[in-house]
From Swiss-Prot:
Coiled coil: none annotated. Residues 28-146, 205-474 are cytoplasmic. The lineage of its organism: Bacteria, Pseudomonadati, Pseudomonadota, Gammaproteobacteria, Enterobacterales. This is Sensor protein CreC. It comes from Escherichia coli (strain K12). Its EC number is 2.7.13.3.
Length: 474
């Protein structure tokens, strides 16, 4: 396959991947966007009907009031509307009214009268002066059977006397959503075609310039008198001019051939690199392979970025000679670090036991939270699935010792003396390699706080990490 075709294929794949990501975001936003717009309409409708329903509710017999009569007539009234190509042939609103205790007094579907709806989110929140809404599955086995309800209070002056809730099936919005998704897909296909045409033109221009430069380089290698080609690109033109200048300066010397060969070789090396990169994409891998390759790139990029940020943070920390100590609530600290790692704990089904401790410790809050978080991260990494981690604090008259106990395999004897060294890390069960800076950061924080950090194996299995700090300012 020619290099021009490889470049075109590589460009097209890059554009296709980018378009796929953008398209996925657009399509993903269609459904919630339509539902948010519908929710706005529902709250307007509910507010209007709540005003109309007030006399019926005050009369004491809303099932025979004007609102009930209107809905009864509506059910027998045929209508048809064409909304942008979508035919609407029936009313899809479901309306019910409750009293101030949440008991249903009127139901347009005649199914829930007399039932207690005070626990439904729309009624419960509205009765408490808040915005009430909910989305409920009519059929638990059918995820498309959900109905969106929005409620409004029925007021008699400043007194709340009931709630009116308006519901609409989400399935009624499906035609609009599907049509929008189809239009986005068509527009994306057209955009992709335009990008392909533009890419073909760009690749043709680049390929022509590279071919001219290659012919010129070959001629210079053979010591043939050839004019400097017009390459269009300023970078390639400067490169050709440099090559021409070198050829002129070395002309007539015995080693001209050696220099030109070396220069030509250096010129062909980046071309070979471009060719090699294009060959990786020439087979046109399926989207899932492209996605996996992209995910790998993003993962490695994130890892490098995290390493750089950790290095910078470590360097800043090591350059600090003093810190501003404040009273840190240990219970709140435990809560923050544990909540921040809920996902990691859930992924490995690890049980985290947090021992309540009402005590303060003298530290800089951000640094202490990062240090304790590093100890907890380390425990999560080395604790097997369905294991257990205990977060506790031991208090004496002068010190508070924060402890993280896991049920992992422990630290090998050969690593105990090096565990706090920078860039030293042990292999994880998942095969991932850490930066080796987490425990070094904890050690440096302990130094700044005039404290002490230790890690030791426990007899029952696992590792106990202890961060000993002062209770009071020193």
């Amino acid at each position: 396959m020619r290099i021009g075709m490889r470049l075109l294929l590589g460009y097209f794949l890059l554009v296709a991947v980018a378009a796929w990501f953008v398209l996925a975001i657009f399509v993903k936003e269609v459904k919630p966007g339509v539902r948010r717009a519908t929710e706005g309409t529902l709250i307007d409708t509910a507010t209007l009907l709540a005003e109309l329903a007030r006399p019926d509710l005050l009369s004491g017999d809303p099932t025979h009031g004007q609102l009930a009569q209107a809905f009864n007539q509506l059910q027998h009234r045929p209508f048809r509307a064409n909304i942008g190509g979508i035919n609407k042939v029936r009313n899809e609103y479901h309306v019910y009214m409750t009293d101030a205790q949440g008991k249903v007094l009127f139901d347009s579907a005649n199914k829930a009268v007399g039932q207690d709806y005070s626990r439904w989110n729309d009624v419960w929140l509205t009765l408490r002066g808040q915005y009430g809404a909910r989305s409920t599955l009519q059929n638990p086995a059918d995820p498309e059977s959900s109905v969106m309800y929005v409620a409004a209070p029925i007021m008699d002056g400043s007194r709340l006397i009931g709630v009116l809730s308006v519901g609409k099936p989400n399935a009624a919005m499906a035609p609009v959503i599907k049509r929008s998704e189809r239009r986005i897909l068509w527009a994306s296909a057209i955009l992709l075609g335009i990008a392909l045409v533009i890419g073909a033109g760009m690749v043709w221009w680049i390929n022509r310039s590279i071919a001219r430069l290659t012919r010129y380089a070959d001629s210079v290698t053979d010591n043939k008198p050839v004019p400097l080609p017009d390459l269009g690109s300023s970078e390639l033109r400067k490169l050709a001019q440099a090559l021409e200048s070198m050829r002129v300066k070395l002309e007539g010397k015995n080693y001209i051939e050696q220099y030109v060969y070396a220069l030509t070789h250096e010129l062909k090396s980046p071309l070979a690199a471009i060719r090699g990169a294009a060959e990786i994409l020439r087979e046109g891998p399926p989207p899932e392979v492209v996605a996996r390759f992209t995910d790998n790139i993003l993962t490695q990029n994130a890892r490098m970025q995290a390493l750089v940020e950790t290095l910078l943070r470590q360097a800043r920390l090591e350059n600090r000679q003093e810190v501003v100590l404040t009273a840190v609530d240990v219970a709140a600290l435990f809560r923050r670090v544990s909540e921040a790692r809920t996902v990691q704990l859930a992924e490995k089904k690890i049980t985290l036991h947090v021992t309540p401790t009402e005590v303060n410790v003298a530290a800089e809050p951000a640094l202490l939270e990062q240090a304790l978080g590093n100890l907890l991260d380390n425990a999560i990494d080395f604790t097997p699935e369905s294991g257990c981690i205990t977060l506790s604090a031991e208090v004496d008259q002068e010190h508070v010792t924060l402890k993280v106990l896991d049920t992992g395999s422990g630290i090998p004897d050969y690593a105990l003396s090096r565990i706090f060294e920078r860039f030293y890390s042990l292999p994880r069960a998942n095969g991932q390699k850490s930066s080796g800076l987490g425990l070094a950061f904890v050690s440096e924080v302990a130094r700044l706080f005039n404290g002490e950090v230790t890690l030791r194996n426990v007899q029952e299995g696992g590792v106990l990490a202890s961060l000993r700090l002062h209770r009071h300012f020193t």
